[in-house]
């Protein structure tokens, strides 16, 4: 009966990102139950106490407790934020060796509980580890989702909104590809309202292509800048994870840029990578295939190739 009327989220990893996600989830009143699981039990217990002390101010009551992997059995969604953090000077791909073994242990432990829900992966390198989660879990590909380029897309829309002086909600633009150094902007589908940005540039001398190129560079390198200043990024990605959570638990059929499995879309195979996808209670309903121009298609293929080159070191069927 609980599975029919209650939404349970199991959060694995209560570091900066995990704790921020738990806080944002409680504040938005999306889930009914939240169980925190961490190798550092004292930290998880402290977070539970802290969150529960603020529950009276939340929009709706949420049952929050510290648990273990067996609590994943009745979870609708398992969110993985555990793993080694990116340090100054490191790329996200530098974290692969550190986190692959951690993920094997985590996913095996979750599946032993009898879990039959959806995985949402946030740990970097997210595209690689989402693929690993799919392989380790044996779940259908649509029920394993990575945060992908949801934060990059949000950063992109924010900076474009600042440049064009419009609300971010009126900016429609995507960052796709690896959540990392090979990601790319889809300028051919970027719009302010319903007006293509390329059209705005051609009609108004106030806006310059060079400025837009700098905006993308700032999007791509934003994590490095934040890490250099404060040691880690966590608020933005936590909000993105909650947005994906809402789309899943509320069956929204929302289009979000997540790390999704490609099986021929964008002319790519056997890779998880950031693309727009329709998200609902069943996970990824379908991948939205944008018609890329030739340059974008080449950049996207390069991004997928970089990811597959790394995956091939760990999985024999990736070529």
Swiss-Prot record:
PANTHER family assigned: L-2-HYDROXYCARBOXYLATE DEHYDROGENASE (NAD(P)(+)) (PTHR43128), L-LACTATE DEHYDROGENASE (PTHR43128:SF16)
Keyword hit for rRNA-binding: no
CDD domains per the UniProt record, alphabetical: HicDH_like (cd05291)
Record: active site: 179
Pathway per the UniProt entry: Fermentation; pyruvate fermentation to lactate; (S)-lactate from pyruvate: step 1/1
Location, primary (coarse class): cytoplasm
Binding residues annotated for NAD(+), in chain numbering: 17, 38, 43, 69, 83-84, 105, 122-124, 147
Ligand binding (substrate): 86, 92, 124-127, 152-155, 233
Physiological role: Catalyzes the conversion of lactate to pyruvate.
One example GO MF annotation: L-lactate dehydrogenase activity
Protein's recorded name: L-lactate dehydrogenase
Complex formation: Homotetramer.
Localization of this protein: Cytoplasm
EC number(s) reported in the record: 1.1.1.27
Coiled-coil portions: none
Biological source species: Geobacillus sp. (strain WCH70)
């Amino acid at each position: 009966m609980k599975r029919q009327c209650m939404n349970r989220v199991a959060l694995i990893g209560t570091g900066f990102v995990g704790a921020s996600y738990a806080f944002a989830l409680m504040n938005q009143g999306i889930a009914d139950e939240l169980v925190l699981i961490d190798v550092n039990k004292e930290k998880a217990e402290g977070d539970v106490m802290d969150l529960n002390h603020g529950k009276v101010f939340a929009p709706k009551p949420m049952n929050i407790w510290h648990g273990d992997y067996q609590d994943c059995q009745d979870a609708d969604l398992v969110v993985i934020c555990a793993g080694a953090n990116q340090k100054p000077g490191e790329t996200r791909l530098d974290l692969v060796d550190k986190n692959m073994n951690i993920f094997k242990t985590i996913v095996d432990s979750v599946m032993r509980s009898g879990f039959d829900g959806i995985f949402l992966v946030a740990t970097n390198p997210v595209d690689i580890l989402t693929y690993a989660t799919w392989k380790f879990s044996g779940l259908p590909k649509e029920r394993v989702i990575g945060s992908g380029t949801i934060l990059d897309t949000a950063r992109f829309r924010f900076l474009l909104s600042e440049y064009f002086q419009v609300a971010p909600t009126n900016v429609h633009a995507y960052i796709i590809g690896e959540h990392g150094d090979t990601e790319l902007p889809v300028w051919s589908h970027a719009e302010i309202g319903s007006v293509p940005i390329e059209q705005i540039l051609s009609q108004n001398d106030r806006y310059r292509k060079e400025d837009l190129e700098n905006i993308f560079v700032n999007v791509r390198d934003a994590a490095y800048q934040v890490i250099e200043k404060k040691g880690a990024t966590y608020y933005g990605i936590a909000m993105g994870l909650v947005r994906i959570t809402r789309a899943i638990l509320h069956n929204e059929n929302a289009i979000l840029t997540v790390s999704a499995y490609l099986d021929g879309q964008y002319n790519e195979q056997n890779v998880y990578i950031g693309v727009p996808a329709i998200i609902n209670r069943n996970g990824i309903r379908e991948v939205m295939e944008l018609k890329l121009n030739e340059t974008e298609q080449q950049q996207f293929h390069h991004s997928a190739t970089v990811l597959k080159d790394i995956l091939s070191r760990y999985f024999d069927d990736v070529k």
